[in-house]
Design a protein with these regions (language model features):
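Hydrophobic residues in well-ordered beta-strands that form the structural core
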Residues: 52, 80, 120, 144-145
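Rossmann-like NAD(P)-binding element
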Residues: 76-112, 116-117, 121-124
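Rossmann-fold dinucleotide-binding core
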Residues: 32, 128-155
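Short, well-ordered alpha-helices that flank and scaffold nucleotide-derived cofactor binding pockets
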Residues: 39, 43-47, 106, 110, ...
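NAD(P)+-binding Rossmann beta1-loop-alpha1 motif at the extreme N-terminus of oxidoreductases
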Residues: 18-87, 152
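Charged/polar low-complexity intrinsically disordered segments
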Residues: 3-4, 12
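Short, ordered loop/turn segments at secondary-structure junctions
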Residues: 55, 123, 148-149
Length: 155
């Protein structure tokens, strides 16, 4: 408990595949889904190099404008779509709602780098998780089912 995810990865895994690293050799992070959990994770990490995408930022609506404002306020780099958002990420966190979990995994698979980790924080059905794992693995990523046991809150 209390360890950050980077410390849990073996050092050699940080240089695996075609995933680009930052100058500090810190894994690039992408977050798909910028609701309560996604925004709290980004704010808690306090980094300026996190890329994020949320389907609700698309379109010319008040909801899209509000979502884009939330992302700007959090200081993340706003992606145009899921695939381009994750393209250079080594650690991808899917924090979308359960009903969007499969669509998100499919969209991420189009851009995931070889050996990149896909952390699925969704509370969807086991059959959906199995489908998501197959899609991510087939695309070259590493699927990790993450059990979230309590509400994610900002620091």
């Amino acid at each position: 408990m209390g360890q950050n995810l980077v410390s849990l990865l073996p050092p050699e895994s940080l240089y695996h595949g075609n995933v680009t690293m930052t100058q500090q050799n810190t894994p690039k992070i992408a977050v798909i889904g910028f609701g309560e959990a996604g925004s709290c994770l980004c704010q808690g990490w306090g980094r300026s190099d996190i890329r994020a995408f949320d389907i609700k930022q698309i379109g010319d609506t008040d909801i899209a404008a509000d979502k884009t404002r939330q992302m700007k306020d959090a200081g993340v780099i706003i992606g145009d779509d899921a695939a381009s958002t994750v393209r250079e990420a080594y650690m991808i966190f899917s924090t979308v709602t359960a009903d969007q979990a499969h669509a998100a995994a499919s969209a991420v698979a189009a851009g995931i780098g070889q050996g990149a980790y896909f952390f699925d924080l969704n509370s969807c059905a086991p059959s959906t998780k199995q489908k998501n794992a197959a899609i991510i693995t087939k695309a070259g990523g590493r699927y990790v089912d993450v059990a979230v046991m309590a509400t994610i809150t900002p620091k």
